[in-house]
Regions:
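Conserved short alpha-helical segments that host acidic/polar catalytic motifs at enzyme active sites
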Residues: 1-131
Length: 131
């Protein structure tokens, strides 16, 4: 399982993002991640392993580095997220809550079509990137 939280505001969103994502902590125990965007700094991202500690404990010391009025957070039992994508459509942060049961088959089909994957999670293709 997992859960995600996103926010866009006229003012800084870091506190809302932190508490909104923390609210989903009961939905997963492997990894947590936050990403914010500001015009001045672009994307700022942090991902932590939650297997031995709580979300709040892991991220409280990171909060000062986050800036911006748009952000997304994730609690995930599968992959390290958010991932930052740079494409012809622009740069963006993305998260998913999913379980792809045939990921190896899909990965093989896409690789045969000359696609590529950059994000790995536990030596496997990150399913968020696959989606």
């Amino acid at each position: 399982m997992g859960g995600f939280f996103g926010t866009v505001s006229r003012v800084g969103c870091v506190t809302d993002l932190f508490y909104g994502t923390d609210y989903n902590s009961h939905l997963g125990t492997k990894r947590g991640g936050l990403a914010t965007y500001s015009e001045e700094q672009g994307f700022i991202r942090s991902i932590h392993n939650l297997e031995s500690s709580y979300f709040r404990t892991k991220f409280e010391s990171d909060l000062d580095k986050f800036k911006g009025n748009a952000g997304i957070g994730i609690i995930s039992d599968t992959d390290a997220q958010p991932i930052i994508i740079n494409s012809h459509l622009g740069r963006f942060a993305i998260v998913t809550v999913a379980k792809i049961s045939n990921i190896q088959e899909l990965e093989e089909d896409l690789l045969n079509q000359n696609m590529h994957f950059a994000e790995l999670s536990s030596s496997n293709t990150n399913q968020t990137e696959l989606i």
